[in-house]
């Protein structure tokens, strides 16, 4: 089984390569842009058949240069929600995705692609339906526009797809192999580094009607994201747009406390309550950044009805379980 993974040296892409390797699949064409070379570390311990630069891949794939490819996991994109260059964003996230889609349909190759919960933006309902899609930035719009294009070409539920097309609206993903993402890495990653350096972690103060640290997101562990992607690989008859979160919103305070307690326990210190951690200065609330006002999702929670109706019954880790596993990985990793 030959598989292509775009964005293969990135966070989700490299974890997908690992997940495929764990199944004994190594006939993998890894596609990425290693201009920022540090990302190579995400692939160094994995097995792939070939590496192709992203600038060369799309035309070569359209020409059939790689023979029969079973599926493309399309994770390659500009995922910086603070990026203001709309042309760059649309070229990378929309135009190239459209070209890849048409090539996949012509060659009978399945396409499993990364959409985003950013398509919902300011909505308070997170269900895969146009009336709830209100992106707050050009990143969210670039992802929404491709979803809309797929609906126009394939039908509302992708029922007219010649071969499988499945889009996954990732919520707040965290876990191993995200260290290259800088400011766009998860809050758990940043808090690990803060605690190691300063003995405390930082969270936004009150904003949007939420108390300090009380803003809520659907935080999903990377292992769960990989498991759902691979479930769809095993079920080629399933197409459509699907939320990929836990279906459970948890406050940022839960993440911070899981970070603090896991790292304290590694030092043989007792677990603390949120109140004690705040009182002891281990959780520090900072003023909400003016640059994010009006552009920030204070609440997200994936509606999993479509995913469950498709037959995927995967059980997702909660923040306490996933963050604890991630902290243990970070503490032992050489990154």
From Swiss-Prot:
Disulphide bond pairs: none
Enzyme Commission code: 5.1.3.20
Binding-site positions, NADP(+): 11-12, 32-33, 39, 75-79, 92, 143, 173, 181
Binding-site list for substrate: 172, 183, 190, 204-207, 217, 296
Co-factor note (free text): Binds 1 NADP(+) per subunit.
Pathway(s) served: Nucleotide-sugar biosynthesis; ADP-L-glycero-beta-D-manno-heptose biosynthesis; ADP-L-glycero-beta-D-manno-heptose from D-glycero-beta-D-manno-heptose 7-phosphate: step 4/4
Molecular functions per Gene Ontology: ADP-glyceromanno-heptose 6-epimerase activity; NADP binding
First-level EC class: isomerase
One biological process term in Gene Ontology: ADP-L-glycero-beta-D-manno-heptose biosynthetic process
Reactions it catalyzes: ADP-D-glycero-beta-D-manno-heptose = ADP-L-glycero-beta-D-manno-heptose
Presence of keyword Cell membrane: no
Required cofactor names: NADP(+)
UniProt-listed InterPro entries: Epimerase_deHydtase (IPR001509), Heptose_epim (IPR011912), NAD(P)-bd_dom_sf (IPR036291)
Keyword annotations: Carbohydrate metabolism, Isomerase, NADP
Role summary: Catalyzes the interconversion between ADP-D-glycero-beta-D-manno-heptose and ADP-L-glycero-beta-D-manno-heptose via an epimerization at carbon 6 of the heptose.
UniProt similarity note: Belongs to the NAD(P)-dependent epimerase/dehydratase family. HldD subfamily.
Domain notes: Contains a large N-terminal NADP-binding domain, and a smaller C-terminal substrate-binding domain.
Known partners and oligomeric status: Homopentamer.
Name this polypeptide is given: ADP-L-glycero-D-manno-heptose-6-epimerase
Native source organism of the sequence: Polaromonas sp. (strain JS666 / ATCC BAA-500)
